[in-house]
Curated annotation (Swiss-Prot):
A GO CC annotation given for this chain: extracellular region
Main location, first listed in the record: secreted
Compartments it resides in: Secreted
Modification after translation: Contains 2 disulfide bonds.
Organism of this sequence: Iotyrris olangoensis
Keywords: Disulfide bond, Ion channel impairing toxin, Neurotoxin, Secreted, Toxin
Protein name per UniProt: Turripeptide OL57
Expressed in which tissues: Expressed by the venom duct.
Amino acid sequence: LTCLTKMVECIQLPLDVEDSSDTLCC
């Protein structure tokens, strides 16, 4: 569930850097 919570924050972040987002999400 921690991953899902971080994913929400990830979605809020700029989608310009999708690769970095995925890493930060999980």
